[in-house]
Structures are given as C-alpha cells and as structure tokens.
C-alpha cells in the first residue's frame, strides 16, 4: 500500500509539471504574436506615411504646374498681333500672375509662345527708353515708325538713337513713336509697364492733338511688306491732316535687279563696315582680309519682291572692293543668302576667321538668338559646326546706333519735310 501511494504521488507531480509547462507555453505564444503584430503595424504606418508624403509631393507638383500653366496661357493670350479692348488688362494680369510664382514655378512656364524668358530674361534697363507717346504735340509731328524690339538696351540705343537724332535735327517738329509689331508692344507693356503706340494709336493721337503737318519716317530697311502695311495705314488718315509726307526707308528705292544700287546703299555699306572693323580692332576691311577675317552681315530676309535689296547690298560691297564682306539673311530669301550658302561662300573665299554682325536696325531677338544664340540652328553654331573656320565671333550691335546711319535718316526726313512746301 505504501508503494502504491508513492507511485500515485509521483504521477500526480509529473502531471502537474506537464500542465504547468503547457500553460507556460500557452501564455508564451500570444507574447510572440503580439511582437509580430506590433512590427506589422509599424511597417504599415511607415508605408502609409510614405504614401501620404508622396501624395503631398505629387499634389505640390501638380499645383506648381497648374500655376505655371496659368501664366503660360496668359502670356500666349497677349502674344498676338491684334490689339483689343482687353489687351491692357491682359498685360497687367499676366505680369501679376508671373510675379506671384515661386522661382521653381517660373521655370515650368511653357506654352505655345510662352517661356520663362518672356518675363525672366534681362534685356537691359527699360527706363533708359522713351516711348514718345506724349500729347501736346503741336501742329508739326514727325512720326518715327519701327517694327520694334522687346530688348530694352537695343530699343534705347538703336530706335531711340534715331529718334533723338531726328529731334535734335528738327526742333520745330515733335518726334513721336509707333511700332508695327503689337506682339512686341504687348511684351514691353506687360513686362516693363512701358506703353508704346501702335500705328492706329499714334495716328489717333496726332488727330486728337490737332496736328496739321505729318511727316512719317520709317526705320525699316527697305520698301518691303512692313513698309507697304505702314503706307496703307497712313493712307486711311491722310484726309485728317493738311499735309502728309512719307520719307524713304534706310536703303532707299529698291531698284530693278541686283546690279542697281544707290547712294543710300553705299552709305550704309560704308557705315556698317567701318563700325565692324573698328569693333574688331582692325584699321580697315583690307587689313582684316589680310588677317584672314571675313564679315558676315545678317539681315532678316523676305519673300517680298524687295528681297533683291540684299543682293544689291552684296553688289555694293564688291564695288567697294570688300572681298571679305558677305550678306546673309535669317529667312534665306533670296536663296543665296541662306546660312549654308553663305558658309560655302566664305569657305571658298579662303577665310578662316568669321565675324557675324546684324544687318538690321536693331540688335534684338534675331541678333541675340538667330545669329549669336547657343542653339544648334543659330548662325554662330552652324558656322562652328561646319569645322571650316578657326574662330567665329559675333558683334551684337544694330545699325540704329551708328552715327552715319542716323544722319542718313536725318537726310531722308529733310527731303520729306521739304516736299511739303513744293
């Protein structure tokens, strides 16, 4: 009996121990499960935070792009050639919207015509210019008509330079300004708050001020499309003045073919080459030629019949003995003035150094971008890419700042004023 009691006691202790272990194990399993659950929850929280941050970033990027797109649309709305009753308000709205952007948002502005450069590019101090839109004109007005430029420094030096020379020469006449490019007028107004008259505004201003005698001096290079549009606009106002006269553009009469040149073309050829060699550090065109340097004068080009003027300027250079002077055009009209054609001419003539300079009244967008820009299709880049030249340099200066050219306009204006008394 005693032995059975002992065995029962041992069995009872063993069973109790087993039950204790089982209970311990049962309690241990939930502890491990809790740790796993905590880890999973922490991971989910981190992923949720990352997702939220990514969503916030995406939302911020969308908001930035939306703000930039709004400005681009406002710029495109004023990048037009027609002025409307809404133009002034649109110019103001576009500038205010641009100013409200962050620097990062400004870099995102991209539209059909819009880019960060529209408002962001530094083209000089607009306050140095004079829009010449004052009233109290008097009886005699000298209206200077230009295509225009949004480059502030060029506008002040080239266009204002001509206007100032005319005002000095004719103090009894009030010099006023008109631009024919509404796109440029809007750009300058929106960016710089400078208000320049278009043709209709300038002529309406003259009528409202009681002008009796109107002389119009275009700064255009030739009798091209811009000149034709200007004369058509003036024709509609002729009966509102006692007398009207239109002066010759810079290069005077066109002539029948490339061999026909005149004193105006000779004067301009001499003026631009004198300035070019001086800027380049040479004594003369001949000295530059001996040093292997060619000058390429880049005009705009036109499909108008007046494009023969460019060939006439090439003839004029040759008549002056300038074997290292070449005339080209941005538009490649006439065809022999296209960049590729000019590169071939300069190469065949044996010149290894090239200096590009605009054959334009103002050194504006064409001079800065089409001629001297860094893009692959600029003239500077194409001359360099040809591999035919040791150096390619640019002189970004318009014709309007050259004294001899300004005096040529003074002479043209004198002829127009004199015609009023004949």
Model regions and ranges:
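Bacterial N-terminal signal peptides
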Residues: 12-18
